Amino acid sequence: TDYRMLFPGDGIDGIKRFFLDTLMTFGKRGLACQPAIVGIGLGGNKDTCMRLGKEAACLRVVGDRNPDPEIASLEDELKEMGNSMGMGVMGISGRSMVADCHMEVAFTHTGGMPVSMHCFCLSSRRASARLHADGKAEMRPNPNWFTPYYRRESVS
């Protein structure tokens, strides 16, 4: 996990630079086990930013994309950038540093742009089920934690 407060003028290039710097540091120092699922939180305050990044890494399904087309495009671009660094599984050379990249965004003050990055180990396992009152258990392959309400898509 890493966090940085960027200047608003850093824009998308600042996010990309932070992503590559952090990923390279994680890979060289053995702080992430590759291939990793990367979660990026952007906006809010520090607490919100960190929470969004962790949720993006841990709760979203691999292959899922943000409903905002610009964010989805950035997720794909960051994944490709991460895999083109020349680092692969266990820090050995290769093109498999990032299994997937997810980004969640929150509203923030214009004076700063908080960004956090979290690497979630590919070997992690999870399951989700809904338990009913009659004792029936229903497995949920995609629990849809990120609803339009949760993402505040209805806020204009």
Where are these regions (language model features)?
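Non-transmembrane, aqueous-exposed alpha-helical and coiled segments at domain scale
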Residues: 1-40, 44-156
